């Protein structure tokens, strides 16, 4: 019997490349040939890397006049818009742009040559410069937790366009707006943000801004209205993301908006409500006050251009984006969630971590650990315990709950009428309690040397209408100010090498891990059911996340009920199940919060844990690589995932699980395109001697498999 896995597309990159980026290779297999460059010609500036290009006019004013998908040979831009719109002291001001385009359906070079600057705009392009990409913030790398070293900052080029006030326009006199761009090597990705410098001699208020405005070609034409429109084939993400969803969609309708284009009079949609205009702006505020001589920076927007409609391929592109602009997500320590924070339990956990190969301990919720206790006795105690762990090569950290708490005393968020906090309750980070809370976090981590931190709830984006809190003035600036408080803390942690697990989408601000995506009450189900559901969670959670970006949860002790049927303790009495959980997780390269008081309780338990930790560390580079989704677990047949890394000696690792009570023997057809192999593959099962297989024209091999009942096998592909 054969199972056919859908052949993955894009076997050859078509389209022209620049002189410095000629490469016939798929950029997802090898992007090294696609090097960023910036060129000026005929009053135009072109940023390109051979995969995409963005073209700007330099005269008569600065504007985006082209955005090309070179891979597919298509133009994405249909109309010229301002580079940005900034409202200062209540006055909306366009930054750059050109006017005079006859229709908004498409854009020609002839029209561009006849277009004029927007005379309503109080700014004009006065300077531009190119350079190398600078780091957004410091990152102290933990190479011992990474499969391979990655560059920081990412490689690529930057361009800054400076717009100054036009003469005789008083509203913008003394203001300077810079539009910043970055393009990255080896990936069709561009970043943009704006900054404002106040040289007016008086305080200004940045009421609002739109930092990206792009009129993309619509993905479909429909005369009638629709509930769900197909959007242009790009992926947009900002570093202004929150909401507790543990999904990249945290940006949408918080900082990323698809809206109708009021200038698009000739669109097919009769009511002209089709979203064909991308705007990147905060949902409220920022209402930021900028002192004389001060400056303001917006959030950053990244646009990733897709070259396919294939879900796996677009997911691989998104995962490569995170490795490029947030490479700390590749840190993937093996960790334990310790349920008791007394000294004896912590030292015992450290010793067990050494024996098993675990690398990190988090003092779990309900353990008795309280990071807000900054008494000198508590600080000294945890400094001694941290030093004890560090001397043995183990890192120590703890858990803290932020959102969903009710503080009282005027310190909670004051919501506008008819609105509730995301989690029902939440303190305001700008209240005096909030300011003291973060002072305690900084002090505790600095004093004790803690090098990992789990921040539950985080900041979900709740606004606050109070005008009595010291950290914000009122409703309009409350979200922006609170977000800055928490992201400043996360960036500080990242610079110190403090590993962050945060159940929200804070990756671009320093977080390394969020929830993979699971229902906590499922860990109270019978053990056998947990095994398959666990693998389903991993399969579903790794379309947009790398294995290292999502944590799973394994309650070694009873968790939210379920009794003895759901519980792994005593560990030695449930070795087959414990072993299956270890195989599920380490075989996927996914770390779990192993929550309990110990990792082993007998020599045979210790050997089982050591077996799978050693397996993970031996194959860490390939197990931390992207997952190709082969067959989703359903309890009816084998399920499988394929790790692929064409740059590694081990090009692939195929994990196959058999949930059935009888062996499964069959020929499995597997597409190994993303391993980078094209003619032959040497495949070895469970570290046995390998066999040579021919790869067909669809990049598939036929692999005979024989998986024992309730077992698993792994296959190394070279």
Feature-to-residue mapping (PLM):
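Alpha-helix-loop-beta-strand connector modules within alpha/beta enzyme cores
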Residues: 382-394, 478-498
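Sec-dependent N-terminal signal peptides
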Residues: 4-13
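Solvent-exposed beta-strand/loop surfaces of large extracellular or lumenal domains
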Residues: 268-279, 678-702
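Conserved structural scaffold segments of CAZyme catalytic domains across common CAZy folds
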Residues: 25-26, 100-411, 435, 590-636, ...
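Active-site-proximal loop/short-helix segments
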Residues: 364-372, 376, 410-420, 454-479, ...
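Active-site-adjacent "subsite" loops/lids of carbohydrate-active enzymes
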Residues: 326, 342, 380-387, 391, ...
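Bacterial Sec-dependent signal peptides at the C-terminal "C-region" and cleavage site
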Residues: 12-24
